Amino acid sequence: GITPQRDFIMGGKWITYTAVASPPFVTGLGRDRRDGNREDFRNLIKLTQMLNCLHTTAGYPVEPTDIHASVRHLYATHDAVTLSDKPPFVYSLGRQRNIDGMEITRIARGVNQETFNSEPSIFSVINASTPLRYDTVMLHGIQEMSSRNQVICITPFTLAGAMAPVTVAG
């Protein structure tokens, strides 16, 4: 993580509790459902920081769709490392996004490349696209993260309608 007291073990006999990952909408406190935005994203990062029952976020607590997708990861990672000291997350949606996320995290920790490469500080989750299929950008994410000894969670999870059929064939 950003600070050693937030470090935790992921995998094996350990369970990791995280905030929700990337819902497109947000609601609450008498406000109607609305598209995800940076203000709500930042507020949810702060809430996650205050909830000691959560180890980290596991994506964006809401997708900040008011930030262009080409630079969204830069703003989101910056907010994650400045508003929370819990280990940040980077989406593996292309090699450069992983590199950017790792560099932002390294700078936030105030460590050199060698230290960063020897101390896992950021993680990514790779979900199979369709049953056991991993696309090029996912593989690039795995390569970039593993080349710097950072954490990658690889899951067989597929989401109906997004990475798999909406209904089960019958």
Predicted segments with their positions:
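Helix-rich catalytic cores of soluble enzyme domains
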Residues: 25-170
